[in-house]
Amino acid sequence: MDKLDLHHTRHEFVRPKLIRFIEDRWNKGVEAHIITGHSDEMKAIVIKVLDEYKLEYRVGDFAGINMGFIKTEI
């Protein structure tokens, strides 16, 4: 599993950082956790990019306790 920690990243830098992360791992079947913290704006930026790449994702863990990350497979 790969992790991208966007916590404390300025929103303007999230999109290019995430795109670079995705493209470096494209079609490798890598499970990835994208750490967003609890910022709704940060999550919205990440989800928009994941949608553009048509990647399935889940926000947080199954129990709904930790909602500060987004899980996907690249």
Task: Please state what every model-predicted region is.
Residues 1-74:
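Long, charged, low-complexity intrinsically disordered regions
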